[in-house]
Amino acid sequence: MEPDGPEGVESDVGAFDAFYLAFSTALGGSDEPDMAGVRIGRYELLEEIGRGGMGAVYKARRADGAFEQVVAAKLLRRDLGTEALHAQLRNERQLLAHVDHPNIARLMDGGRAPDGRPFLVMEYVEGTPIDRYCQERGLNTDERLDLFLTVCEAVQHVHGHLVVHQDLKPRNILVTPGGRPVLLDFGIARLSELDVGVAEESPA
């Protein structure tokens, strides 16, 4: 089934597996089979790079011949296929599709896999978790504050689109080799609440 998310994104993106640690370790493991080699919508899943309680994250590539593109595909578990979760995922995807900010990882596409499971296609970001970046680069207090303020501006921007992260932590913020912090995984924490018995909250 063709995805129903935003189309026509032609920019090249980098690759760094640490981007997906937050998603793949947030809620534990699962017994889902490896889907490498399967095509979902316009994308072929190349290799699994993370797995967690909500599903798995794959390195993927655009496979419809339109252009070359490497992305991250987040595929939900089969047993999380409740209508409430699907509806929430659609809502989050629609909100995130309108977010365009240099310090927020872009939602690029989304839809349902051949077996009916929802998936998200996200920008593949090259970078280092912000805490490790600061330590490895030996940043002083002013330099760290500059990064922090940039992150705050990105959070403020996305809040203006009625999206709340709810899981901000160092491994959800990568800093690119050029020093640009990028926020990751908006909406994922909220989605997990719907299937683990936690009351749903309205976006603030």
Can you annotate each of these PLM segments?
Residues 1-27, 141-142:
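Low-complexity, Pro/Ser/Thr/Gly/Ala-rich intrinsically disordered linkers and tails that serve as
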